[in-house]
């Protein structure tokens, strides 16, 4: 069974945890409790293939930004989540995207733009970035599966493209140890 390491990023309060818990437990969490970092696993079938999603739900608050590089290194794909009722969270997406590309040292990384709490000019940004856009509501569960499953499909496409291009990386395989900050 293929395992996918998914990372959910975005500003504080956009609904990253609510989306993740809705996917994992079919339950909407109404109250806001800032996340430092939570990890979830779920076995799902996507396009006929059984796979294991290893999902890292990250902190959106600025005081935890030092942790970002580490989880960006280990993630295979990223849900870039903003709240459609917060222009600032939408503007922050570009910063997350650039940081992911810098840390991964790659121009193309599997990402899905997720507009949670539904309806802003986000579709055009996703088109400009060349990545899928999914509107979600963690409360009603609208688009929750689609967001995570689309990201897995993006990872598969990315692996396929890299396999076809036969690109070899000269970077050594590195293992990272946990650091206390």
Curated annotation (Swiss-Prot):
The UniProt entry lists membrane topology as: Lipid-anchor
Q: What is its EC number?
A: 3.6.5.2
GO cellular component terms, alphabetically, are: membrane; plasma membrane
- Gene Ontology terms: biological process: signal transduction
Activity regulation statement:
Alternates between an inactive form bound to GDP and an active form bound to GTP. Activated by a guanine nucleotide-exchange factor (GEF) and inactivated by a GTPase-activating protein (GAP).
Renumbered to this chain, motif Effector region spans 32-40
Keyword Nucleotide-binding listed: yes
Lipidation (S-geranylgeranyl cysteine) at which residues?
A: 178
**Per UniProt, which keywords does this protein have?**
Cell membrane, GTP-binding, Hydrolase, Lipoprotein, Membrane, Methylation, Nucleotide-binding, Prenylation
At the top level, the lineage of the source is: Eukaryota
EC primary class: hydrolase
Q: Which GO terms describe its molecular function?
A: G protein activity; GTP binding
Keyword Repeat applies: no
Q: So where does GTP get bound?
A: 10-17, 57-61, 116-119
Catalytic reaction annotation: GTP + H2O = GDP + phosphate + H(+)
Name of the protein in question? Ras-like protein 1
Q: What is the lineage of its organism?
A: Eukaryota, Metazoa, Ecdysozoa, Arthropoda, Hexapoda
């Amino acid at each position: 069974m293929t395992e996918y390491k998914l990372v959910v990023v975005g500003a504080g309060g956009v609904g990253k945890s609510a989306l993740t818990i809705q996917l994992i437990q079919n339950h909407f969490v109404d109250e806001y409790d800032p996340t430092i970092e939570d990890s979830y696993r779920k076995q799902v079938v996507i396009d006929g293939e059984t796979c294991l999603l290893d999902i890292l739900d990250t902190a959106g608050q600025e005081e935890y930004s030092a942790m970002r590089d580490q989880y960006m290194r280990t993630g295979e794909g990223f849900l870039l989540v903003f709240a459609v009722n917060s222009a600032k969270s939408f503007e922050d997406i570009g910063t997350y995207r650039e940081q992911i590309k810098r840390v991964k040292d790659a121009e193309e990384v599997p990402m899905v733009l997720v507009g949670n709490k539904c309806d802003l000019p986000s579709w055009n940004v996703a088109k400009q970035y060349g990545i899928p856009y999914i509107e979600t509501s963690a409360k009603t569960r609208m688009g929750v599966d689609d967001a995570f499953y689309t990201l897995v499909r993006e990872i598969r496409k990315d692996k396929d493209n890299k396999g076809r291009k036969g690109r070899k990386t000269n970077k050594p395989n590195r293992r990272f140890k946990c650091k206390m900050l």
